[in-house]
Amino acid sequence: NSFKSREITSTVGTQNEVTIAAIILDAYRAFEILSKHPRIDRDRISITGWSLGGGVTLFSAWLPVNNAINQNVKFKSHLAFYPPCFFEPENIQFSDSPIHILIGELDNWTPAKPCEGFVSKLKNNSANINLTIYEGSHHSFDKDSPVIRNENAYNFSDCLFQLTEDGDVLMNYLNIPMSNSFLQKLGFMFCVSRGVNYGGNPVARESSFAFAKKFM
């Protein structure tokens, strides 16, 4: 558990205690351990995640990451539930394993619109990636609870960050790497607001579960 092992309970409202990069490394190390188990077929190990974990799922397929950590790691498939797609990778080389994004039309925490551009760009580069947008659904559409509001959480609806091949995330306007918590807070000031809605949609919940069973 990438949170518990670091004594972190939540990244809501800050997004800097545990990074996507750190959890991707955790995922690769977990793959390496699982692949040595005599009862596990390394060619059938897939990855899925939600929100921040969805970002981990998505970018664990990014070849610059794969090449930097372990080129022998290859997930069978990547299923990302409402990931942050508001990154524009300088290098758009991704794994040829199937990648699929499930996201809500009304998501204002990790908005769907950047995912459309992200998927289109990768498809044009022959990536095996697809997107499902659930109509009338918010972040956490697969929860079994009504939609509520969190006034403290970051709303990324107006953000689109550049991602260099070296893995640096650049501020929207200054092109300065957000390489520490201070610079990240500074970068967020240009586009992030507070307040998001999240909660379940019964139709999207059942549909996403059925899709996951087939895809994984």
Regions found by a protein language model. Name each.
Residues S10-T11, I92, D142-V147:
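Short aromatic-enriched loop/helix-cap "lid" or pocket-rim segments at secondary-structure transitions
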Residues N1-S5, P84, S137:
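Short beta-to-alpha linker loops that shape the active-site pocket of alpha/beta-hydrolase fold enzymes
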Residues N1-H37, M189-N197:
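Serine-hydrolase catalytic machinery in alpha/beta-hydrolase-like enzymes
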Residues S95, H100-I103, D107, Y134:
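Short beta-strand/loop motif that positions the catalytic acidic residue
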Residues N128-M216:
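C-terminal catalytic histidine-bearing segment of alpha/beta-hydrolase fold enzymes
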Residues V18-D96, N108, K113:
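Primarily recognizes the serine-hydrolase "nucleophile elbow" in alpha/beta-hydrolase
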Residues T110-K121, P146:
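Short alpha-helix in the alpha/beta-hydrolase fold that links the catalytic acid
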Residues L106-T110, H139-S140:
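Acidic catalytic loop of the alpha/beta-hydrolase fold
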